[in-house]
Regions:
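A structural motif corresponding to the C-terminal lobe/cap of the Radical SAM core domain
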Residues: 35, 192-199, 203-383
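Glycine-rich beta-alpha loop elements in corrinoid/cobalamin-binding modules
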Residues: 1-83
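Short, well-ordered amphipathic alpha-helices
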Residues: 2-4, 51-52, 187-189, 283-290
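Radical SAM enzyme core and accessory elements
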Residues: 337-504
Length: 504
């Protein structure tokens, strides 16, 4: 409004998340009292064409753009040009912005919300769209979700280095819908190889690919936090959502991140179609147990909203809800009003869920009865009090995928050969001393095993471009020595695994 009043010659374009989801059927000409153009989906080509049209003084070719012509809102998508691939979009240029003069609004209560707004993060994307793309509450029919296109780790690190040079800031927020675990692994290795001193965080799916070792690698590369959707902590509803995870699996993944020193934030949901009162209570109990186990540090409850571009919005009858109206408005058209056939008033749970979570995040009131959070009667939970504890019971996994990558994050050991004598017999032994950032430790092996390991640690160092697979190490070991599995699960190698010998 201020710009239009004082600088009417400046053209103003709107794009991004709000436009992409809410304004796809825009027809209200009043919007154009404030904006000259509204573009949808990927913004690079639409913006380029808008600039070309402004500079040439014509209104010919556009890409997914609303504009006003003869007092009527028109949607123009008549350019034959294709959108830019993610590898071609280049690095965001922040060099002209007064980055040190923006105000930080700090949210104290929620650790993840505080991180979002306390200070500034360089924003990047690992992949366009979502590699999962199935969640039924999500706008999976729109391009920003359904068109999945990952970016190579090398290109991402090039962009990170450029942005560090521009801004002098080394913190990165990857704004992915859900960052792909395999790409996160490659990015972490590339960051370590380039010796980039960065901190970063992103959104994920709590899937089983996030093993203990992968989480340790991500932490070593500078990952400080992840946020992911637990949504409704009920296996029946997670299946209906098509989340592709179970509560038990989420618990294990959050444990892996937490033990690696990475903060975990969970998006929580209530009021999903067909959700019963019992399931809401049980969901709260699951969340309580996750905080009690110390594997969740931050969370936020969202009430389910039905959107026009989600499977629930497109096929409400499959989810036991009835759309109240099919009328399309002239402005925002995404959030839909609906009637849940269960007839449950989910609003009544809002205050109790949020109040309990507020306390859980402070590590208090975990022993309260769930009834204490509500001023109306709720049923007893059906979840066993030790459900999460049992899910987290350690199981030693002796199976390793043959094609798993083996990486050593540590440095070169100092080596000392010695002879051990007992009952008249003597053996040649080797002592390997390692110097970690925090401590010094040593392991002892037979002379031959020690020599083999010293050579191999050099080959599997994170600094090498070529990685070694588990099956390659096994074959190489058994060429010279005997049972590799016995060696791999022996006490000295188990010690190394605690200090950065990773299987990915």
């Amino acid at each position: 409004q201020w710009l239009k009043k004082h600088y009417p010659e400046i053209k103003i374009l709107m794009g991004g998340g709000f436009a992409n989801t809410e304004l796809r059927s825009l027809s209200d000409e009043r919007v154009f009292e404030f904006f000259d153009f509204v573009s949808l989906d990927d913004g690079e080509l639409p913006l380029e064409l808008i600039i070309e049209n402004i500079e040439s003084g014509s209104n010919t070719e556009f890409k997914r753009t609303f504009l006003l012509e003869n007092d009527k809102v028109l949607y123009k998508n008549n350019s034959p040009r294709h959108d830019y691939k993610q590898a071609q979009v280049g690095t965001p240029d922040y060099s002209d912005l007064l980055l040190d003069q923006y105000i930080s609004v700090i949210e104290i209560v929620n650790p993840m919300h505080r991180m979002w707004s306390d200070g500034r993060w360089n924003k990047l994307t690992m992949a366009h769209g979502c590699y999962w793309g199935k969640c039924t509450f999500c706008d999976i029919s729109l391009d920003y979700i359904k068109v999945y296109e990952p970016i190579a780790a090398g290109i991402l690190c090039d962009r990170m280095e450029e942005m560090i040079a521009q801004t002098g800031e080394t913190g990165f927020h990857f704004v992915d819908e859900a960052a792909p675990p395999a790409l996160m692994r490659e990015l972490a290795l590339e960051i370590l190889r380039r010796k980039l001193a960065v901190t970063w965080w992103t959104n994920i799916r709590f899937e089983k690919s996030f093993t203990k070792d992968l989480c340790l690698l991500l932490k070593a590369s500078g990952c400080i936090a992840v946020s992911g959707g637990l949504e409704v902590a009920s296996d029946r509803l997670l299946q209906l959502i098509d989340k592709g995870v179970t509560v038990e699996q989420v618990a294990k993944v959050t444990r892996n991140f937490t033990e690696a020193g990475v903060m975990v934030h969970a998006y929580l949901m209530y009021g999903y179609p067909t959700q019963t009162v019992q399931e809401t209570v049980d969901s709260l109990e699951m969340v309580r147990q996750l905080f009690e186990a110390g594997v969740l540090q931050s969370g936020f409850w969202h009430q389910f909203a039905m959107t026009a571009h989600s499977p629930v919005g497109m096929y409400p009858e499959k989810f036991g809800v009835v759309k109240d109206s099919d009328t399309i408005g002239t402005f925002a058209n995404n959030d839909l009003t609906y009637t849940d056939t269960t007839g449950i008033d989910h609003d009544q749970f809002s205050f109790g869920l949020k109040k309990s979570l507020f306390n859980f995040m402070h590590g208090i009131c975990l022993d309260y009865d769930l009834q204490d959070w509500f001023d109306f009667t709720i049923p007893k939970t059906t979840i066993r009090p030790d459900f999460i504890y049992e899910a987290l019971e350690e199981e030693t996994n002796f199976s390793v995928k043959p094609n798993a990558k083996v990486i050593w994050l540590g440095g070169k050991p100092t080596v000392e050969s010695f002879t051990k004598t007992k009952n008249g017999s003597s053996w040649n032994r080797m002592r390997l001393t390692f110097y970690d950032k925090k401590e010094t430790f040593e392991i002892q092996l037979s002379q031959k095993e020690g020599e083999w390991l010293v050579t191999v640690l050099d080959l599997i160092s994170y600094s090498n471009l070529k990685t070694k697979q588990f099956q390659e190490l096994k074959a190489d070991f058994e060429n010279e020595l005997e049972d590799f599995e016995l060696f791999w699960f022996s006490k000295p190698i188990t010690t190394l695994k605690e200090f950065g010998l990773l299987v990915l």
